[in-house]
Structure formats: structure tokens, C-alpha cells
């Protein structure tokens, strides 16, 4: 096998709580993460030497500035791969959007290289490498519905929440995760998610309960600077969403809809706006 193609799925947060800040500067989180159907296409191929990263979108860094390059480099060092690797990314997930697009690409590179070079590494090994690349990469390797704790590396599987209809909206701003966390004041968080209630709703497939109780503590920081996030949340609710929330550090916002028809109607109502819009599903 000389090449392999993988789907790199985006993620949303169904909740996001920040518990505290560690001495090393990292924040302790407790959040529910969910894969969605929206994805990049990542093609990995063997080449004579070196690592080459290419992307069909000019604003996505190529070469060593791309997280996928870092993932490939770590794989080559860990498993002493002597030949080279070429990585082509067909970008569909918006960048700097709180959707783990870069992490998803890196996870695809780790999984793809394991298969392409017949490394036979188990998932735990791959996740260990992923952890060195970025906090969201281990989740992107596993995918599905997960409770994420620690700095994002402790993952506990939750029953699948697949097939839920989502409308995803990305305004024309990019948000730095580092900036959001550095401006988060833990003593000013007034509303935290009831994570146990949300997990119970997932177990019971109670979409309404989950949608109405989703909470992301980072919204307080990001919305203060980008009021458009609140506008999108309100617009999704006006168009029939059962609930809406910012994903990750933003600025993407999603709404949960009762059925595909309602999601498509909301998408039609939004798609001619100045925002990027997607109709998708949890997987």
C-alpha cells in the first residue's frame, strides 16, 4: 500500500467546564466532546524522504507550521521510519473555530501512518503520541461521545449520541484558544454545566434535556469580545433549535434540532448570511 485516505471529523462540545488552573499553567477541564459528520479529507502517501504537507486552502499553514507535520514527525521518530511521507489535506472544517480541525487532521495522520507503514501500534500508543501533539488529538483518535477530564487527556466513553441533527455556524472571526483561557477568570464563572445531568440525558437519549442544559463557561470570555456569537445563538433558537451553544473556545456556534427537516429549514434561513453555515449530524 503506497497511500491511504482518511476522514478527519470535527468535534463539538456538548458541555465545557473549567475546574481550575494547574501550576504548570494548564487548565483542568471537564467537558463532553462529540464527533460530527463534518470532516476534512487527509491523504497520506509514502515518499522517498522528508515530510511534505499540502493543503487546498491557502490560509492553512503547510510544512512544519502545520500540526499534521508535528504528528508525522513524532510518528517517524517513535517508530524509526526511514522513508518520507506526504500529507494532503482537503480542508472542509473551518480553522480557528473551536471545532478541533487541526487536531482531527493530526489524529488522521497518526492513525493513517500506523496503517500505511504496518506499525501495528495499539490505540493507547497512538493516543500517547497524540497527547504530545495537542490536547484534543487523543479524543480525535478515538472519536464518538466522550467525557474529557484533566487537560483533555483523560477520556471516558459515554453511550453514543449519534444521529442528532446539528446546524453549525462560524462567524468571520478567528479566536485564539490561548487568548480565551488567559482571559478566563475562574472566580467570575457564574453558571457551570451540570455534567451528570447531561450524561444522564445522553444515556436516556433525551435530546431536549441535553439541548436545554448545555453550558460552556468559555462563552463569558469570547462573547465579551465577539458579540456576534450571542447573535448567532439567538438566531438559531429563533429558527427552532432546542438549544444552542458555542463550541470550544469559539467562535463556532451550533444548534441542536429535533429532526433533519427543521435543521435544513434553519440552514436555509441562515446560509445567505455573512456566516459560514453547515447542516450536519453527530456520529
Swiss-Prot record:
It is an enzyme of class 2 (transferase). It comes from the Bacteria. The keyword ATP-binding applies. It catalyses: 4-CDP-2-C-methyl-D-erythritol + ATP = 4-CDP-2-C-methyl-D-erythritol 2-phosphate + ADP + H(+). ATP binds at residues 94-104. One of its GO terms (molecular function) is 4-(cytidine 5'-diphospho)-2-C-methyl-D-erythritol kinase activity. Pathway: Isoprenoid biosynthesis; isopentenyl diphosphate biosynthesis via DXP pathway; isopentenyl diphosphate from 1-deoxy-D-xylulose 5-phosphate: step 3/6. Its EC number is 2.7.1.148. Pfam families: GHMP_kinases_C (PF08544), GHMP_kinases_N (PF00288). The active site is at 11, 136. GO terms for biological process: isopentenyl diphosphate biosynthetic process, methylerythritol 4-phosphate pathway; terpenoid biosynthetic process. InterPro entries: GHMP_kinase_C_dom, GHMP_kinase_C_sf, GHMP_kinase_N_dom, IspE, Ribosomal_Su5_D2-typ_SF, Ribsml_uS5_D2-typ_fold_subgr. Keywords: ATP-binding, Isoprene biosynthesis, Kinase, Nucleotide-binding, Transferase. HAMAP family: IspE. Catalyzes the phosphorylation of the position 2 hydroxy group of 4-diphosphocytidyl-2C-methyl-D-erythritol. Belongs to the GHMP kinase family. IspE subfamily. This is 4-diphosphocytidyl-2-C-methyl-D-erythritol kinase. It comes from Acetivibrio thermocellus (strain ATCC 27405 / DSM 1237 / JCM 9322 / NBRC 103400 / NCIMB 10682 / NRRL B-4536 / VPI 7372). The lineage of its organism: Bacteria, Bacillati, Bacillota, Clostridia, Eubacteriales. The gene is ispE.
